[in-house]
Amino acid sequence: MAKVYYEKDVTVNVLKEKKVAIIGYGSQGHAHAQNLRDNGFDVVVGLRKGKSWDKAKEDGFSVYTVAEAAKQADVVMILLPDELQPEVYEAEIAPNLQAGNSLVFAHGFNVHFDQVKPPANVDVFLVAPKGPGHLVRRTFSEGGAVPALFAVYQDATGVATEKALSYADGIGATRAGVLETTFKEETETDLFGEQAVLCGGVTALVKAGFETLVDAGYQPELAYFECLHELKLIVDLMYEGGLENMRYSVSDTAQWGDFVSGPRVVTEDTKKAMGTVLAEIQDGTFARGWIAEHKAGRPNFHATNEKENEHEIEVVGRKLREMMPFVQPRVKVGMK
């Protein structure tokens, strides 16, 4: 079982007198910066010119280029998309790191897969809230918190663990609990969850269910409701209280169908395929493929995305959602 740390375990905040540079001001960046500031930390924001720069300024932060922010900071938290981090790190952060600084991440991908190679004289750790930035900020403002993970990759100063817990405490995570892990474990489990269950697994299951009903002659609109739209109702029940809560809340007919049919859909062969997915994450196959795809301009990524967006379930869904003005996407579709 994971070791969990709480507020009582952070007796001395070793970062309170240090300057923290938050690199990036998106979902996580704005939450980290504002929570740290509210907890008395000296925070600056490092960005390239654009809308985020203006937003951080409006929120009252001193905003600098990434290089300028990194140069003056003791702690540099990189909250940029994974694929952008190596270039920004090499060009603007690495030349400005000093011995004893802390290089911090919210996901271990680039360090674990050697895309970012920190110098030996800095501490390297991650603090990863298990929720989106808006929730990290809102719960903090309400006196609560989102749990987080932390891991130490490199302890150059001898107090990297204390620094990581101090940072986690600064964003409020110790109110809920901070679980200790490693860069390897955080990275591999995160990627596996996305690919086998949360994104890849769910989308493949939803499409297969939709196609099965449509191919059998049922109306696409009903197939959409049964296989996609109602998924939120079930996921919310699981989110709130696990599988037990979901099964308690649905009808007995639905629960019995769960018991007798679920294992016939997700079979031992499915688990073997999941094992293959995990192995390709562990040995770096997935990472190498994604890095190469990004460097090539993402031709397959964009082609697949365009094709998927025209699947019948998407065409039907767009029409049905026009009937439901209460359903509004949090992020405008097509922004990527």
UniProtKB/Swiss-Prot annotation:
Mg(2+) 1 binds at D190, E194. NADP(+) binds at Y25, G26, S27, Q28, R48, S52, D82, E83, L84, Q85, G133. One of its GO terms (cellular component) is cytosol. Residues 182-327 form the KARI C-terminal knotted domain. Mg(2+) 2 binds at D190, E226, E230. Its EC number is 1.1.1.86. It is an enzyme of class 1 (oxidoreductase). It catalyses: (2R)-2,3-dihydroxy-3-methylbutanoate + NADP(+) = (2S)-2-acetolactate + NADPH + H(+); (2R,3R)-2,3-dihydroxy-3-methylpentanoate + NADP(+) = (S)-2-ethyl-2-hydroxy-3-oxobutanoate + NADPH + H(+). The keyword Metal-binding applies. Keywords: Amino-acid biosynthesis, Branched-chain amino acid biosynthesis, Magnesium, Metal-binding, NADP, Oxidoreductase. Pathway: Amino-acid biosynthesis; L-isoleucine biosynthesis; L-isoleucine from 2-oxobutanoate: step 2/4; Amino-acid biosynthesis; L-valine biosynthesis; L-valine from pyruvate: step 2/4. Residues 2-181 form the KARI N-terminal Rossmann domain. One of its GO terms (biological process) is L-valine biosynthetic process. Substrate binds at S251. The active site is at H107. Binds 2 magnesium ions per subunit. It comes from the Bacteria. Disulfide bonds: none annotated. The keyword Cell inner membrane does not apply. Involved in the biosynthesis of branched-chain amino acids (BCAA). Catalyzes an alkyl-migration followed by a ketol-acid reduction of (S)-2-acetolactate (S2AL) to yield (R)-2,3-dihydroxy-isovalerate. In the isomerase reaction, S2AL is rearranged via a Mg-dependent methyl migration to produce 3-hydroxy-3-methyl-2-ketobutyrate (HMKB). In the reductase reaction, this 2-ketoacid undergoes a metal-dependent reduction by NADPH to yield (R)-2,3-dihydroxy-isovalerate. This is Ketol-acid reductoisomerase (NADP(+)) 1. It comes from Bacillus cereus (strain ATCC 10987 / NRS 248).
